[in-house]
Amino acid sequence: MAPLFRRKTCLRQTRERCFFAGQNFSAIAEDVDTGKVYGLYILHPNNVGRCSHICNASYAVRQDARGLHIGEKLVQDCLVQGAAHGFGVLQFNAVVASNIHARHLYERLGFVQLGVIPKGFRMKDGSYEDICPYYHELG
């Protein structure tokens, strides 16, 4: 199975345990009958100190599960969990500008775009693409 959560380098099983254990909250979208994982997210503080009330999350959805609204359900749950864990704002630092499906979802769910960071994301081929930070105030 291809990795769900892409990083510059792949995580090995022991490093995965440490990585996920270091999050404030991690969730998976799983078919309870088959055990197949369709997506996941991680939730953690975006910063420390006087900005520690702002959280950040990262999402991954299997390519063969796109269109099933898995991402939407993960983001909705993340909004609830962020508030339940005492955060006041959920901020996405690096939404790639060409990821229009994610951007439309975030905007539909009430996220506000903060601007554009030119060439903020390095693509696999070494080129750069703009990123769009977003935020959502939590209940």
List each language-model region with its residue ranges.
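Acetyl-CoA-dependent GNAT
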Residues: 4-64, 75-76, 81, 137-139
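Conserved residues at the C-terminal ends of beta-strands
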Residues: 44, 93, 117
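Conserved G/P- and acidic residue-centered "switch" motifs that form tight phosphate/ATP-binding loops
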Residues: 69
